[in-house]
Amino acid sequence: MARYRGPVEKLERRLGVSLAMKGERRLAGKSALDKRPYAPGQHGQRKAKISEYGLQLREKQKAKFMYGVSEKQFRRLFAEAARKDGNTGALLIQLLEQRLDNVVYRMGFATTRRFARQLVTHGHILVNGKRVDIPSYRVEAGQKIEVIEKSKNNPQISRAIELTAQTGIVAWVDVEKDKRFGIFTRKPEREEVIIPVEERYIVELYSK
C-alpha cells in the first residue's frame, strides 16, 4: 500500500485524532477536526460500535499516517521491533521516532512531518555535515541534524521555529534554533512520546 496522499483533514476526522499533518491550522484551532469532531459523510455523527479487529486496524492506521510510512515500511519496522528484546510496541514507536523526517519535525524545523519529509527529500538537511535525502534514514544518538546554509532563512522553516515556542521541544533533542541545527541526544522512552496511538493493538494485529 502506497503512502497516503489524500485529503488530510478528512482522514483526521475519520480516525478521530489529530495526526499533526496540518500543524499551523491545528495550533490555531482551525482544523476540520476542531470544527467537526466526527467522521465525514452523511452518518458521520453516529457512534458506531467498533470491533476488536477494527480497533487494531485503526491504531495501525493512526501510526502509519502520523509518521507517513507505507504499509511495507511499517511491516518491516514492526518485524525489526519484534526481533529485539523488550516491549515490541514501545520499540516500534522508538524506531518510528528515529526516522530523519520525524527528527527534523521534532526539532521544530517543520510544522508537520509532511513538510519535514519534503525538506529531507529536496536536500535541505545535513546529518553530521553530509546531505541525506532519505526520509527513513535512522538517526542515532549523538548525530547532528542541520539545515543547509542556503535554506537557513527559509520563511517556512523560520515560521515553524516560531510556532515551536507554543508546542515546545521534546526532551531527547538539543536544538540551537538560531543556528538551525540540533543534536539527537538519545532514543526516547515510550512514556515521553505523546501520540494518540495505543500500540498494543498494533502488536495484537501483527501477532495473529
UniProtKB/Swiss-Prot annotation:
GO terms for biological process: ribosomal small subunit biogenesis; translation. GO terms for cellular component: small ribosomal subunit. InterPro entries: Ribosomal_uS4, Ribosomal_uS4_bac-type, Ribosomal_uS4_CS, Ribosomal_uS4_N, S4_RNA-bd, S4_RNA-bd_sf. It comes from the Bacteria. The keyword Nucleotidyltransferase does not apply. Gene3D superfamilies: Ribosomal Protein S4 Delta 41, Chain A, domain 1, RNA-binding S4 domain. Residues 98-161 form the S4 RNA-binding domain. This is Small ribosomal subunit protein uS4. It comes from Campylobacter lari (strain RM2100 / D67 / ATCC BAA-1060). The lineage of its organism: Bacteria, Pseudomonadati, Campylobacterota, Epsilonproteobacteria, Campylobacterales.
